[in-house]
C-alpha cells in the first residue's frame, strides 16, 4: 500500500486504486511516457507517443467511470444557452470499473486498475500514430504491433501528493519479432 493523492494497493498480482469521493469530478491529466524500449526505430525513451488526456472520475452505486473531458467548446454558465449547451456536451466514458470495496469510513471507493493501465488502449501504446503523409509520399510507415496481453502487465506503482505513476511492461510482436516497451502512466 502506498499513499498520496489516492491510495494504491497491490493484493497478490492485482493493483487497486482507492479513490476518495473528494477527487471525483476533479479534472486530471492522464499521460503515458516511454521509460524504456527494445527497438527505438520510431520512438525513444522519454518521449510521449500521444497527447495527454484531460480526464475526470465519477461514481454511482456500483461502478466508477473514467471520463475524457472535451474542452474544445465552452459556454459561460451565465449565458441563457448554458443549460442546453451542457446537455449536448457531456463527457464520454472511456472506461468503467466495478467497485471492489468501499473504505471503512465510506469516504472512498476501491477499484481494480492494473488491467486497465496495462491494456492496449491508444493512450498507453508506445507506437506513434500513422502519418497520413507517409503513405502519400511513399515514406516508411510507423511501427505497429500485435499486443501480447499474457506477457504484459504492471511492474510497479507509486503515489505522490499530486499524482500517481504506474510502470507497465507492454509486449508486442512487431514484424514477427518481440518488442517491449516500459511505460510510465
Regions inferred by a protein language model and the residue ranges of each:
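Auxiliary tRNA-acceptor-end handling modules of aminoacyl-tRNA synthetases
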Residues: 1-185
Amino acid at each position: 500500500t502506498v499513499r498520496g493523492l489516492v491510495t494504491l494497493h497491490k493484493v497478490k498480482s492485482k493493483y487497486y486504486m482507492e479513490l476518495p469521493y473528494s477527487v471525483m469530478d476533479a479534472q486530471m491529466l492522464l499521460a503515458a511516457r516511454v521509460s524504456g524500449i527494445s527497438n527505438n526505430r520510431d520512438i525513444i525513451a522519454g518521449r510521449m507517443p500521444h497527447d495527454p488526456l484531460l480526464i475526470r472520475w465519477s461514481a454511482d452505486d456500483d461502478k466508477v467511470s473514467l471520463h475524457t473531458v472535451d474542452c474544445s467548446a465552452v459556454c459561460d454558465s451565465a449565458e441563457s444557452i448554458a443549460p442546453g449547451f451542457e446537455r449536448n456536451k457531456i463527457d464520454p466514458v472511456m472506461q468503467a470499473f466495478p467497485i471492489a470495496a468501499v473504505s471503512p469510513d465510506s469516504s472512498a471507493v476501491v477499484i481494480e486498475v492494473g488491467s486497465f493501465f496495462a491494456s492496449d488502449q491508444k493512450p498507453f501504446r508506445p507506437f506513434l500514430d500513422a502519418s497520413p503523409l507517409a503513405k502519400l509520399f511513399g515514406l516508411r510507415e510507423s511501427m505497429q504491433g500485435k499486443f501480447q496481453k499474457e506477457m504484459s502487465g504492471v511492474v510497479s506503482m507509486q503515489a505522490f501528493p499530486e499524482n500517481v505513476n504506474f510502470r507497465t511492461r507492454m509486449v508486442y510482436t512487431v514484424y514477427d519479432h518481440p518488442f517491449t516497451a516500459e511505460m510510465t502512466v
